[in-house]
């Protein structure tokens, strides 16, 4: 089971309450529909957000970014999120 910090739990509650977004977490070893999602942030269906590596800093960046978006993320938006993460957190 993944342990989330208090800060991460607070962000999760905000996202779920105000964005009506169900969030699922995956570790580095997880596979989703046979596809590796290491380091990915994927909104696979309306209202369901799947995040890999929630134990890393990108969890907070992803939630903050996605909190302002109600539509399904495009591939380009996912790239933009990862680009932001790599350039601001790494």
Swiss-Prot record:
It comes from the Viruses. This is E22 protein. It comes from Bacillus phage SP01 (Bacteriophage SP01). The gene is 43.
């Amino acid at each position: 089971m993944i342990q989330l910090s208090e800060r991460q739990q607070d962000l999760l509650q905000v996202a779920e309450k105000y964005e009506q977004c169900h969030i699922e977490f995956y570790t580095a070893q997880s596979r989703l529909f046979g596809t590796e999602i290491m380091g990915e942030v994927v909104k696979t269906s309306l209202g369901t957000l799947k995040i890999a590596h929630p134990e890393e800093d990108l969890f907070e960046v992803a939630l903050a970014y996605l909190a302002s978006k109600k539509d399904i993320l495009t591939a380009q938006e996912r790239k933009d999120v990862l680009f932001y993460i790599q350039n601001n957190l790494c």
